[in-house]
From Swiss-Prot:
Gene: ymaC
Protein name: UPF0714 protein YmaC
Induction: Induced by mitomycin C (MMC) and UV, and this requires RecA. Also induced by hydrogen prexoxide.
InterPro entries assigned to the protein according to its UniProt record, in alphabetical order: Gamma_PGA_hydro (IPR008585), Gamma_PGA_hydro_sf (IPR038128)
Taxonomic source organism: Bacillus subtilis (strain 168)
The keyword Cell membrane appears for this protein: yes
Spans traversing the lipid bilayer: 5-24
């Protein structure tokens, strides 16, 4: 019995240590002001090797699935975006630094990377994935397309996920006209703010190099719920 308890304590210690490492390497965005107020300032001061900009064109796609905070900026959102590569156009700005990727965080109302601006204007609808610090599994669904945002909430809840419509008064609602999400042809967007706890649960190993290989059933249930709404509403 004593050995069993020691083993349990050891396992818990390892889990807590790994969790600490994950958070220290990829801390969530803080309430501190961004280092850069726009992309040109970032590009002038950061090495091109420290970030990546990618765009996947899907001919005939009305929807652009994107995140300006991919890679190691808000862990787990890149994998969510890339899941949709075969059905929709996708865009990612990703942090690749070994540490301090929060310096690459540009808030969505200031994010003006040229390729993102160009491609968003070529699509009718935008679906953006983001991360926030929440310690409980939850998704705040915002954006200007409130009708479809509510549908996303219901679809996630039917799959057993905690989700809610972001309050219009919340800073995470994604309603500002300056938000990069809202600059498409129709101005209609869906913005998903996903808690850290929920994003970690999508992978058996949250370490950034291993995430794409360790997506689990919770990941696929989540994206399937979203995909169902997009196929019905934006086809």
């Amino acid at each position: 019995m004593r050995r069993f308890l020691l083993n349990v304590i050891l396992v818990l210690a390892i889990v807590l240590f790994l969790r600490y490492v994950h958070y220290s390497l990829e801390p969530e965005p803080s309430n501190q002001p961004d280092t850069y107020s726009n992309f040109s300032s970032l590009a002038e001061n950061e090495s091109p090797a420290d970030y990546d900009i990618s765009y996947n064109e899907k001919k005939g796609s009305k929807v652009l699935i994107m995140s300006p905070h991919g890679g190691r900026i808000e862990g787990g959102v890149s994998e969510l975006v890339r899941y949709f590569n075969n059905e929709y156009s996708t865009y990612l700005f990703e942090g690749l630094k070994s540490h301090d990727n929060q310096t690459l965080h540009i808030t969505s109302t200031n994010f003006d990377e040229p390729l993102a601006k160009k491609k968003i204007k070529e699509h009718q609808y935008v679906v953006a994935f983001h991360g926030y610090k929440g310690e409980n599994k939850n998704t705040l669904v915002g954006g200007t397309d409130r009708k479809r945002a509510k549908m996303i909430v219901r679809a996630l809840e039917r799959r057993g996920f905690s989700a809610e419509l972001a309050s219009s008064k919340s800073g995470l609602a994604g309603l500002n006209a300056e938000n990069i999400n809202n600059q498409g042809e129709t101005g209609l967007s869906i913005q998903l703010e996903i808690s850290r706890e929920q994003r970690e649960a999508f992978f058996d190993d949250f370490y950034y190099k291993n995430r794409k290989y360790t997506k689990n059933s919770e990941f696929y249930a989540y994206v399937s719920a979203i995909k169902g709404v997009l196929e019905k509403e934006y086809s």
